[in-house]
Regions:
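Conserved beta-strand hairpin/beta-sheet module of binuclear metal-dependent hydrolase folds
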Residues: 2-55, 165-177
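Residue-level marker for buried hydrophobic side chains located in beta-strands
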Residues: 35, 66, 90, 172-174, ...
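Metallo-beta-lactamase
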Residues: 5, 41-43, 61-73, 100-156, 160-224, ...
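Metal-dependent catalytic neighborhoods of phosphoester/phosphodiester hydrolases
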Residues: 75-85, 103, 235
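C-terminal regulatory/interaction regions
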Residues: 250-311
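Active-site/pore-lining binding-face segments in mid-to-C-terminal subdomains
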Residues: 206, 211-268
Length: 311
């Protein structure tokens, strides 16, 4: 079981999303009111439960399960995990709550994208009883310990149903996907590398930029990424994502003007990414490449979707 101790209070459990290590993680905040941030998809729930067991935590002790947004790789397992955590309440953005109570649209949308792979990747998606859902919105707080009151920020850009969570004790921020993706596979090579996540179908570049700049202004000490792990250099990480975001939008606009496919746009995006990795000394083939290729494909789809809606 892959568990990383990030500090005295926060542990990261690898959910092996898509069968990949260091893809999507669940954060465990060891406060008086034990809190989990992100469940991952349903196939990750067994990994989360095993991780809690190894940490000496019983499922009865879990008080809050928070999902930053309702995309299935972050929240698909919420209903399944909640079934085994009898004392837990699920915390979600107001625009996401009804879709977790009645996930039929989430399921239909994912089936349309993933087809025959849906069952292996996401099943089962269990509805969350409405009485076990609590909504948090901009400026709301959640007291989870005598000295810890989590603060919720509305952080659109990746999705409209997205919030981030400020942890005052570590001066850290749980970014979900709004501040992009951290490629943990490159850390062993001494390389900090981040890309934006511009996936469909609610990507909004201006909102994403504003959310990231708000994080920058907070002078944080750590960022906790949904994909994947903790960055101890928040300003540099956020600046990197903003620079790539500008380039992604430029390339997306050009691809849309030329009526290119998502595959063609993904290749456009891959060229500067590969060039920068080569500059940083990354030798190919590298185990990070399947992650990056997958992310660029999804980001290309979101960029084209955005420009179609603007026309």
């Amino acid at each position: 079981m892959a568990i990383s101790k990030l500090n005295d209070r926060i542990q990261l459990i690898d959910g092996f999303d898509l069968g990949l290590e260091q893809r999507t993680g669940s954060y465990v905040i060891m406060e008086q009111q034990l809190t989990i941030i992100e469940t991952g998809p349903s196939p990750s729930v067994e990994h989360v439960k095993q991780g809690l067991k190894e940490l000496g935590i019983s499922l009865d002790e879990v008080r809050y399960i928070i999902v930053t947004h309702i995309h299935l790789d972050h929240a698909g397992g919420a209903g399944l995990l909640l079934q085994d955590c009898p004392n837990a309440t699920l915390i979600v953005h107001p625009k996401g709550a009804r879709h977790l109570a009645n996930p039929s649209r989430l399921i239909a949308g994912a089936r349309a994208v993933y087809g025959d792979k849906f069952d292996d990747l996401f099943n089962p998606i269990v509805p969350v009883p409405e009485h076990r859902i609590a909504i948090k919105t901009e400026g709301d707080r959640l007291q989870i310990g005598p000295d810890c009151s989590l603060e919720f920020w509305d952080t659109p850009g990746h999705a409209k149903h997205h919030f981030g969570i400020l942890d005052p004790v570590s001066n850290g921020f749980f970014v979900g996907d709004t501040a992009g993706i951290r490629y943990a596979q490159l850390i062993e090579d001494g390389i900090d590398f981040y890309l934006p996540s511009t996936s469909p179908n609610q990507f909004d570049p201006e909102a994403m930029k504003a959310s990231i700049e708000r994080m920058e202004s907070q002078q944080l000490d750590v960022l906790y990424f949904g994909h994947y792990g903790a960055a101890m250099n928040p300003q540099a990480a956020l600046r990197q994502v903003l620079e790539w975001l500008e380039l992604f939008v430029e390339e997306g606009a050009a691809a849309y003007r030329h009526d290119e496919s998502a595959d063609q746009l993904a290749k456009r995006l891959a060229a500067p990414v590969m060039a920068q990795l080569a500059e940083k000394g990354v030798k190919q083939p590298h185990r990070v490449m399947p992650y990056i290729e997958m992310d660029l494909q999804v980001s290309a789809q979101g960029l084209l979707d955005y420009f179609r809606k603007q026309s």
